[in-house]
From Swiss-Prot:
UniProt gene name: lacC
Annotated GO biological process: polysaccharide catabolic process
Protein name stated in the entry: Probable beta-galactosidase C
Source organism of this protein record: Aspergillus oryzae (strain ATCC 42149 / RIB 40) (Yellow koji mold)
Family: Belongs to the glycosyl hydrolase 35 family.
GO cellular component, one term: extracellular region
Record flagged with keyword Cell membrane: no
Glycosylated sites: N197, N276, N391, N421, N434, N517, N602, N677, N715, N720, N759, N805
Amino acid sequence: MRLLSFIYLVWLALLTGTPQVSATDNGKTSDVAWDKYSLSVKGERLFVFSGEFHYQRLPVPELWLDVFQKLRANGFNTISVYFFWSYHSASEDVFDFTTGAHDIQRLFDYAKQAGLYVIARAGPYCNAETSAGGFALWAANGQMGSERTSDEAYYKKWKPWILEVGKIIAANQITNGGPVILNQHENELQETTYDSNDTKVIYMEQVAKAFEEAGVVVPSSHNEKGMRTVSWSTDYKNVGGAVNVYGLDSYPGSLSCANPNSGFNLLRTYYQWFQNYSYTQPEYLAEFEGGWFQPWGGSFYDSCASELSPEFADVYYKNNIGSRVTLHNIYMTFGGTNWGHSAAPVVYTSYDYGSPLRETREIRDKLKQTKLLGLFTRVSKDLLKTYMEGNGTSYTSDDSIYTWALRNPDSDAGFYVVAHNTSSSREVTTFSLNITTSAGAMTIPDIELDGRQSKIIVTDYSIGSESSLLYSSAEVLTYATLDVDVLVFYLNAGQKGAFVFKDAPADLKYQTYGNSNLSALETSQGTQYSYTQGEGVTAVKFSNGVLVYLLDKETAWNFFAPPTVSSPTVAPNEHILVFGPYLVRGASIKHDTVEIVGDNSNSTSIEIYTGDEHVKKVSWNGNLIDTRATAYGSLIGTVPGAEDIEISLPSLSSWKAQDTLPEISPDYDDSRWTICNKTTSVNSVAPLSLPVLYSGDYGYHTGTKIYRGRFDGQNATGANVTVQNGVAAGWAAWLNGAYVGGFSGDPDKVASWEVLKFNHSSLRSRDNVLTIITDYTGHDQNSQKPIGTQNPRGIMGATLIGGGNFTLWRIQGNAGGEKNIDPVRGPMNEGGLYGERMGWHLPGYQVPESALDSSPLEGVSGAEGRFYTTSFQLDLEEDLDVPIGLQLSAPAGTEAVVQIFMNGYQFGHYLPHIGPQSLFPFPPGVIKNRGQNSLAISMWALTDAGARLEQVELKAYAKYRSGFDFNRDWTYLQPGWKDRTEYA
């Protein structure tokens, strides 16, 4: 029987020109299956159009739904999500999945509500430019042994995490009515030894078993770290540890913020890669470039035009389609914020990433362009089963054009993806394309590519129950099967388009409404309709009932096809068409009214096509708007914006200041601090001196650390001090209250070795106190030598010069250490500055009368520190979304460490001498858009030149009238001050 089946498959392959592969499942569930073409969910093929989202980087659960609605509206049907162990586990065997933004059940619920599937990525290791790559920081002090191997010490640490988070993932699988369709094992773990006894192979088997023990049954996946190794594919040297669906990570842009002409070189070898190494599986780009992170001292995202360009999305993402990719995840789609101390040293506070959705949750043109592809893939079911018919420069009349040619073996639908062969080219090229259709071979003339532009030319393409295109040189945005078949095309304004209906009558009549005039030409293959794309919306009504919309690209950016169902899969008869607004979050039809929920910055016209003759009215965010009916069946009106609203943000005044470095004084009482008395470390990196001064050995992992070392005698002339707290992290030292040196931080140095020079007059015969305060930019990721995430933090070594030894060291860090005394904000929010330990940054803190009337604009005159607090009131209108940030600047040459706390959340780490970030946004929920807000700024000078700011100002990024409810009681996310004197 197997032989007969094999013969049949060979015969079928010869007949269709492509191998046939039956759908496969993992033996645990058939709800999610796959073959060489695509993933299938509940028996239906799915183009996975996914966006990467990290809930930890947006600590307001209600706003997760805001982001999800924006992704859904812009063509996405899936989100890919990291779950950071570090965020949920402040100490060993303690997990928080319920408090505030730690409640990941809400994540799954909101994803389902928005109509998005979920790809779960819980590690244990995640990387993601987050501190320690997502490992729990209590475990990253060296006690994990050889991380990301089968080392027993490591295994005992990570397994409880996977079991705990795995149970929640399992409960939210599609098999249980939830949105999870794939579960990733580990992250970019490179398989270098193909041996079943290899430690990495054993480790991957352990991870698989742990997820299985937790109840996860959906297919497993992994993400290859670029085309450097071949890892964990069942189709290549499978000795164990392989996953069900192999994925590849790729960031090919090589773009430069400083030079917009550099990079932009397409990689055209994805198809070959997948054919070599995962040929029985669908092509899955588990992470594809949606932007790129920026380091300390680098560029700020808003100024990086090359990363923000919609051209990248147009050319690169369509190239992936041409490569037969059918699982496509964009990393990042929304980046968010590295608030608190959650960043790895390679990034600063903002994790905007240059992503399609800005850190402020605003829609960039890049997302609008991405939407055009998302909506196309949503309805193009024939794209989900194609073979590579060919590729190269021979398909066109101009060899400067490269073409991918895909063919569906069942329907013969064709997809020709064209772009400049030199993808960085800015030339305008007009050419003819040779195509194959059911009516034979033919040539489409007058196709134009304007520099960095790509197009998908379709043939034998179904656009409804009774209509098809023989071909079109205009790009299909979407189509709908409503009362009639409705087709939406787009082109750049001024470009020519042509299309032919398949098997349509030759004498079709049509009426045009708009700026693009259509002409008809009889050909042997049918009537060709040609036009030059004008600006705005043009509608063409054909006598066979088909309605065609012709849009210029910028108009298409503000086109939406809101589904009328909640499922991530949307059939052509399950959405309506809306033109004009900034955002359409959703739409529904009730009786004679179409109810639309959306956002608008400026008043715009709106056009709605529902295909329902009973619909006569339009409601926008609950309010009826005046409309008129068009001759072709749509309704047109105007929806309001926010341009008439004046946003007046309060000036920041009435500052109070207190000393946040009282520990500088030799008389400071540190008797309750942790004594550094260890002579051996759990860390394999040997300390440079004893006792061990690694902060992690004493339970302090995040933020500022303060050390006080004591010694006797007046012989010491200085000290050798080595500090390692991440790139760009500085530190300063005081002897008996006098500044003696330090290091201002360097974005190129992971550690610093400094010689402190003592003034003899500052020395005492007994009980000298050397106070060292260190900044912190995060724990390293796995790739940083020598031991990755477990590289020690704090003082690596400290010895006296000139005679004598330290007699006692004490350390202080974040209040409570691993106790997680503020579970809502979580274990990475605070550091060890005195003001933080005392809770001066928290709402409700009452400033004592002894506090100074002083602002950050006055600053400090020497090597000192201040903690500044003030409050302000906001009273924005209830239907407004106004992203707000804090703009800082400092005089040139200022070397200081500045932190911003909004209602208790550390939402800004500002190093004016390193940069680049100086504007720090706060999402609603961290800031109250209606109510009293508490703002605190900590600042300490890294040198005796002092420090001050010259600008501290609230800034509004933009304003939108919104159908989303931002007018909420955020109190539960902003717990207030409680007495903390025990942590002094």
